[in-house]
Design a protein with these regions (language model features):
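Short, highly charged low-complexity linear segments
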Residues: 79-82, 96, 103-106, 122-137
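Short secondary-structure junctions and interdomain/linker hinges
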Residues: 29-30, 58, 72, 107-114, ...
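Mixed-charge (acidic/basic) macromolecular-recognition segments
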Residues: 112-155
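Bulky hydrophobic/aromatic packing residues
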Residues: 35, 92-94, 127
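Charge-rich, low-complexity amphipathic helices
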Residues: 41-45, 87, 105, 125-126
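A surface-exposed partner-binding patch
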Residues: 1-83, 139-174
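Compact, glycine/acidic-enriched structural inserts
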Residues: 84-119
Length: 174
């Protein structure tokens, strides 16, 4: 399992036996210069709560597992076992009709632009001296799109992810 994803991230192991093995191997790791990251196991409960506070309609129905360079969080829906994509900079939640394995082996591998906004990351990475984000950092909007911020590189800044979510969460419901 996860062969395509592991190849994409150039991981030394080319297969893991299941979701539990995936987390045992990749717990807290960052991939592709910070484009995609897996939460540390000890942070999953905390981040599930943070996301649920920002998006209260999902309280008790999700468990987070990963996030991208823009601080957008991916979570599993407990009722359907499919992926939800929580976007603090836009206030949107997108339903990705894939399970955990399909999300990694198909969405991230075949559709990185759709799943991780990878071209925008490449532009940002190039314009910021190939800065590799720390696991606790994200690139967020200075002015969120739902407050008429521009969707361009000049409106982005590196932030501590927990601070970014703390600032954006109350604004999402405006």
């Amino acid at each position: 399992m996860f062969e395509r994803f592991l190849e994409k991230i150039n991981y030394e192991k080319r297969s893991v036996s299941g979701v539990d093995d995936f987390f045992a191997e990749l717990n807290g790791k960052s991939f592709l210069n910070g484009l995609y990251r897996i939460f540390r196991k000890d942070q999953i409960g905390k981040w599930t709560t943070i996301v649920e506070e920002a998006f209260p309609n999902y309280k008790g129905t999700i468990e987070v597992f990963g996030f991208d360079w823009m601080g957008q969080v991916f979570a599993m829906r407990k009722d359907t076992n499919t992926v939800l994509w929580f976007q603090p900079g836009t206030g949107d939640v997108l339903d990705i009709p894939d399970d955990f394995v399909e999300f990694h082996d198909t969405e991230i591998v075949d559709y990185p632009e759709d799943a991780l906004v990878s071209r925008y990351f490449d532009d940002w990475f190039e314009n910021n001296g190939h800065y590799i984000l720390k696991h606790s950092e994200c690139v967020g909007y200075k002015i969120p799109l739902y407050l008429n911020g521009e969707d361009d590189l000049n409106n982005l800044e590196v932030s501590d992810m927990e601070v970014y979510w703390g600032v954006m969460s109350p604004l999402i419901s405006l």
